[in-house]
Amino acid sequence: MGKVIGIDLGTTNSCVAVMEGKEPKVIENAEGERTTPSIIAFANGEKLVGQSAKRQAVTNPRNTIYAVKRLIGRNFIDPMVRKDQGIVPYNIVKADNGDAWVEADNNKYSPSQISAFILQKMKETAENYLGDKVTQAVITVPAYFNDAQRQATKDAGKIAGLEVLRIINEPTAAALAYGFEKSASKTIAVYDLGGGTFDVSILEIADGVFEVKSTNGDTFLGGEDFDTRILNHLIDVFKKENGIDLSKDPLALQRLKEAAEKAKKELSSAVTTDINLPYITADSSGPKHLNIKFTRAELEKLVDDLIEKTIEPCRKALQDAGFKASDIQEVILVGGMTRMPKVQEAVKKFFGREPHKGVNPDEVVALGAAIQGGVLNKEVTDILLLDVTPLSLGIETLGGVFTRLIDRNTTIPTKKSQIFSTADDNQHAVTIRVFQGEREMAKDNKLLGQFNLEGIPLAPRGLPQIEVTFDIDANGIVHVSAKDKASGKEQKVTIQASGGLSDAEIEQMVKDAEQNADEDKKRKELIEAKNAADSLVYSTEKTLTEYGDKLSSDDKGAVEEALAALKAVLESEDTALIKEKTESLTAASMKIGEAMHKAQSESQPAAKSATNDEKIVDADFQDVEKK
């Protein structure tokens, strides 16, 4: 079994790590950074990933996709999707299956596809470091992700060419990294406020056993919401001062978003910052500039309710685990937003203790995923991870009631069966509708999927015995079966969201990703060939100017002809032709090299004579000194 990488697929940034010896290590990307922006852009037929995509976002907002994790596994009519539509500059569209997809460069992409592009970048980063192919990964998700979101993340891994050995909850991964090779027994809370999601998990750690007691959270609360508050504040201030509404200008919005994110980060260490955006817009009187002094106090006032929203899940998680705040011995902060002093203050106030700051909030999740990868390929031993399902699972029964089969915070993997019956006389088929959530009526919960069990022997209502079994695997993904006890007829399914990608769609996306990888490779070869050719043209022209008079007219003509031929194809897209002309010029340029060598040889005797004279003078000088 080869190396298993751990990937933190984040809303704002992503990170990849691997076990190196007995320690997990974060791998730097090609730009030398330890995290990569979770941003994809499409520009001039090219796909950009990470920092290169982020750099051009201001000039290409409609084709730059960010924070797609907030859409993954969601239906287009989901209220959270509607909320996002009013914020992001790119188009969110309804897919044929009812899911929320994105549109860029006149193409539609599923959130799983966009996530796959980011995962491919993580995969390449690891392969460049390890010098070997990587095919297996552990990928993290927010603990409060439902089944549809987990399945969509697993699909993203498959599209990226990865076998996803395990989907692991982010707070659990952080706890693994925190408690790795520590022997002390502790009850800890992991408070994870990232770019787009919030989770809190309560765990007990003892002798290498990491047992999650409870988890809670909000999959639509994070740094993006904080940025939006600042952005809206800037729009309001500018409108008040200039009478111009910047919210209708996509280019201005993108600049404002970047400025909001930058100001938020700066105010974690400073108490005031200046936001200066020259030429943000223009009217009949000329260009307009945005200059605003923004303080930490103003920021805290803007986002106070968002921070407060994280406290109720903490309270519920403690209650479900059967603990009081005073029982928690350590609070681990995870996610970039936990650098904000006001967030740290709120955590300290609720738990009654100073939070632990000994882990890097941006990297700890990827490190934990790498440790779990090490466990799965036997590199790491003596660790047992016991996670939980975040939401209750059940089916819809008579009257639209939600009947639970598995309660939230049940340790996984787990299996549970229950006997149900028919609602009508002579009913020969039943529809099993599977839901996930905490509300009492099925319609108020998340419909994960449905299937039919047919061929039930005709009988009065209430007589047939139908055994429904729920099986949740270690990834938190749900498998359901229904069996008629009398006939033995059985129907089994791995629940796929009512939307979700079909197997055929996933396979097509895998092929597209492979094709894109080939195209990317060809593009890279073309760029490298052009760079080499351009460099050769420059050096040849320079040396031809200096030593051209030393060449015979035939040799000089041959070099000039090869030089002109290469310059003529420099702008073409034909890699083979550019390489061919480069080789021709390289061969012709050897004559210049010979001329240079000859010129240098002719000057050497004079140089030697000068050197000998210097030695004689030096010797005479030393003799005089001795006298």
From Swiss-Prot:
Polar residues bias (residue ranges): 601-610
Name listed for the protein in its UniProt record: Chaperone protein DnaK
Source organism per UniProt: Rickettsia africae (strain ESF-5)
Family membership: Belongs to the heat shock protein 70 family.
InterPro entries associated with the record: ATPase_NBD (IPR043129), Chaperone_DnaK (IPR012725), Heat_shock_70_CS (IPR018181), HSP70_C_sf (IPR029048), HSP70_peptide-bd_sf (IPR029047), Hsp_70_fam (IPR013126)
Induction record: By stress conditions e.g. heat shock.
Residues bearing the modification Phosphothreonine: T197
Region (Disordered): 593-627
Gene3D superfamilies per record: 1.20.1270.10, 3.30.420.40, Actin, Chain A, domain 4 (3.90.640.10), Substrate Binding Domain Of DNAk, Chain A, domain 1 (2.60.34.10)
